């Protein structure tokens, strides 16, 4: 399932003015900064804007509590600045960056399903939703879901399938989390959301770019 940003509200509430960067600076991999960030609102929307602004793919694992509102006010902020301010505001999450990927997960711990090892995943000309379905139907994922007594459910009513983008991806020897990151990157949805619910249920959705 894919959550359209239009359905989630206007991202313009995040007041961001990007600092211009020369080609030389880009080649030197100078950290990108945002001149002004003044945001108060849904945490998922903030992370969607972070993905756009800094050119990273975000993997968000939500705990069983309702997503909370966050407040971030920064000047000349790097990605690290924004993410540190985010976790300080939520007080329930932690984060890490690995190359172009930013992972966010609960302080209380991650769902072990996301660490399931996947031997091979090779799909062609699929939508993100179709790729999610095929990924979660892999034998190793299904076996781990059974062992952990987990069940997939549909995302909340605010989510619907809106993405028509098609893409292909081939992966070997990755975790479920890493596979979700690659799906998000290759399909350009840029952020996926794994939400934990009580009683062993979970959902996977994404935010379309």
What annotation goes with each model-predicted range?
Residues 2-209:
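N-terminal targeting/assembly segments of extracytoplasmic apparatus and virion spike/baseplate proteins
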């Amino acid at each position: 399932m894919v959550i359209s940003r239009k359905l989630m509200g206007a991202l313009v509430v995040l007041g961001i003015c990007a600092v211009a960067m020369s080609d030389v600076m880009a080649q030197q991999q100078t950290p990108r900064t945002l001149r002004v960030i003044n945001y108060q609102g849904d945490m998922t929307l903030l992370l969607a804007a972070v993905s756009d602004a800094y050119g990273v793919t975000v993997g968000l694992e939500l705990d069983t509590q309702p997503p909370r509102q966050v407040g971030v006010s920064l000047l000349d902020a790097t990605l690290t600045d924004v993410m540190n301010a985010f976790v300080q505001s939520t007080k329930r999450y932690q984060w890490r960056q690995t190359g172009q990927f930013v992972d966010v997960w609960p302080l209380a711990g991650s769902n072990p399903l996301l660490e399931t090892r996947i031997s091979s995943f090779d799909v062609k000309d699929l939508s993100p939703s179709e790729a999610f379905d095929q990924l979660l139907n892999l034998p190793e994922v299904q076996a781990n879901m059974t062992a952990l007594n987990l069940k997939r459910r549909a995302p909340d009513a605010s989510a619907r399938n809106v993405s028509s983008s098609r893409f292909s991806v081939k992966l070997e020897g990755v975790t479920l989390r890493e596979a979700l990151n690659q799906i998000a990157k290759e399909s350009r949805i840029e952020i996926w959301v794994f939400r934990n619910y009580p009683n062993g249920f979970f959902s996977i959705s994404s935010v379309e770019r």
